[in-house]
Amino acid sequence: MITVVTIPRSVSWKGDAIAVLNQTKLPHSTEYKTLTTIEEVWKSIVMLEVRGAPAIGIVAAFGLALASKKYTTLHIEEFQKKFNRDCNYLGTSRPTAVNLFWAIDRMRESIQEITTIKEAQKILEEEALRIQQEDEAVCRSIGEHALTCFKDGDNILTICNAGSIATARYGTALAPFYIGKEKGVHLHAYACETRPVLQGGRLTTWELKQAGIDVTLITDNTAAHAIQTKEINAIIVGADRIVANGDTANKIGTMNLAILAKYFDIPFYVAAPLSTFDITKQTGAEIVIEERDETEVTKIFGKQVAPVGTTVYNPAFDVTPNELITGIITEQGIIRGDYKREIASLFEKTS
């Protein structure tokens, strides 16, 4: 029996505006925010109202389609100049998430041969919708492949939120939970709360509960103890950037889990679409790591919890070395072994 799973949508195109699920309001209220300018799109990404590498790429694509609509009276050369400026502007919002730049480049390339602004506007809207539709299919495929790594009743640990609200639908790391639910395969999620912004506590638990999937929330510090005492069978995480040798940038704390997985001899999987790969970079040392505002650490929900003036180091991501990764699950299948060779081979086949 197939179960229909209700999954919330993160981004919706309204023709003259973008509706985004405001993730800063979760889990207390489900509010969709309307974005009507590229400046609002940029701010929504920076403020984490929309987040998750694929979702950021989707909203950026819609943002460029939206911005193009205000340039109707320009000459085509001036249109291209302003459009390129908008592309560069959106690229400053989140430097680590490669899907952002992938989507921007794809939108830019889609109108290279246009001769009229009306044609460009039509193509940009169609391309943004295509990016969203493709991401949903990609995430479902990731979920299908990931589900082959697990069995009914498995306890699986994750961090941050690589779920439906971080993508077009299904998510990456959470996709096997949804596909499993549809197929009657019961997987139990253990979600790290994910300090300092609590994406695990606020978002992963919220969306899995919405879908009726079993989830247990733990503090980040509990991960080792949970693996030791709760029969955790595997760890699965998403990714914000995977480079040519398989080194993976993901939410800060991910590398901690990879090290624990190696110690306890359980599989550590990364789930991500091919659009998250950056094969122009050879190792994780080349990845630019975003550092965020100190108040994310010194305050919790606006309340000061550390002495004023405390020095803070607040990187948003860390880089997990490829040797700690059991497999990278993509829409094309699972990459294992010699990541540099296998990733190069995969991109040769798909190019």
From Swiss-Prot:
Question: Is this entry keyworded Cytoplasm?
Answer: no
> Which positions does UniProt annotate for substrate binding?
51-53, 94, 199, 250-251
Superkingdom of the organism of origin = Bacteria
- Kindly list the biological process annotations in GO that this record carries: L-methionine salvage from methylthioadenosine
- Record SUPFAM superfamilies: NagB/RpiA/CoA transferase-like (SSF100950)
Which protein family is named in the record?
Belongs to the EIF-2B alpha/beta/delta subunits family. MtnA subfamily.
Q: What does this protein do?
A: Catalyzes the interconversion of methylthioribose-1-phosphate (MTR-1-P) into methylthioribulose-1-phosphate (MTRu-1-P).
Protein's name according to its UniProt entry: Methylthioribose-1-phosphate isomerase
Species, as recorded = Bacillus cereus (strain ZK / E33L)
Give the source lineage, highest ranks first: Bacteria, Bacillati, Bacillota, Bacilli, Bacillales
